[in-house]
Amino acid sequence: MKFLQSFPVILAVFSFAANLVSSKLVYEYETKYVTVEIVTIVSGETTYTTERLETNGPTSTTTTIVIPSSKPSSPESKPKSDSQPMFQSPSPVQITPSTTSINNAPSPTKPETTVTASPAVIAHTSVFVVTPNSAPTTSSSPPNIVQQVKAAITPSAPKPQPQPQPQENNSGTNDDSQLSSFSRQILEAHNIKRASHGVNPLTWSNELYNYANKVASSYDCSGNLRHTSGPYGENLALGYSSGANAVSAWYSEGFNFGGAGKLNHFTQVVWKSTTQLGCAYKDCRAKGWGLYIICNYQKPGNIIGQELANILPLIRS
């Protein structure tokens, strides 16, 4: 924004010329008529003021001749030059920017995250039993777990009688004499139970043993049992002092021949179509458990729809 003010001012500008003509001083006076304009400029919060000269009248010249007495006297003052306009630099103006204070701005809210745990899905293809011989010394309570694929049956097995601990190494490998002792014991225990039902005895399979031994070697003695879901029939046990005691616990589950019998550890032990056996173990007594025992069967038993042909009743006690 501009504000313009103008008023006439007579500015006398003298041009001095001193010439010596016939021992005389000649003075010439020049008069100019100008107009002074004061311009005010407002820009935002800053104001500027300037002055501008403009010539708006005729110029007159007056000549005066003076005869000096002895020495020419110097003029009292030197005339001002009229070539430069008058201009006043604007004074600096400090502008303080306005600020806005926000005191009640809401703090950002951290989004809440809800995590919903999905239930674990565990698939079992065979059955297994965990029944300890005695309460582990390092566990708060002894395990008493029975799980299987087709049915869950709580066995009423009698407490196994204390027997000498097997001397085999943890996985049942490397020492043939110890391995054969364990394999003979558990194979014999199977065949005694099978003979009571009039089915053929099982034979030992190195292929099944190697499979079972691989699983036993990797067991962590945690007290949790999980089936391998392999191509063979499978029974698991934990907490027993020998393979024979584990077989007795499996067999004690029994089968209801007069009604809707359920497939379990017993039915796999006496399954008629099964012909081969391979078992291995790991010693978990150092962690408060007994032996971890795994037995694999070929052909696998517990096949739904084949119960009548493969589960025969007891013929002798």
Curated annotation (Swiss-Prot):
Inducing or repressing factors: Induced in hyphae and up-regulated during oral infection. Expression is higher in white cells.
Region annotation Disordered: where it falls in the sequence: 52-116, 155-179
Location(s) in or outside the cell: Secreted
The SCP domain, residue ranges: 187-297
Main location: secreted
GO cellular component: extracellular space
Keyword tags: Glycoprotein, Secreted, Signal, Virulence
GO biological process, any: sexual reproduction
Knockout mutant characteristics: reduces capacity to damage oral epithelial cells.
Stretches with biased composition (Low complexity): 58-76
Keyword Transferase: no
Membrane-spanning ranges: none
Signal peptide: 1-23
Domain of life: Eukaryota
Residues of this chain annotated as glycosylated in UniProt: N169
Compositional bias ranges of the Polar residues kind: 84-116, 168-179
CDD domains: CAP_PRY1-like (cd05384)
Pfam families on file: CAP
Homology family: Belongs to the CRISP family.
Biological role: Secreted protein that acts as a virulence factor during infections.
Protein name from the UniProt record: Probable pathogenesis-related protein CaO19.6200
Annotated organism of origin: Candida albicans (strain SC5314 / ATCC MYA-2876) (Yeast)
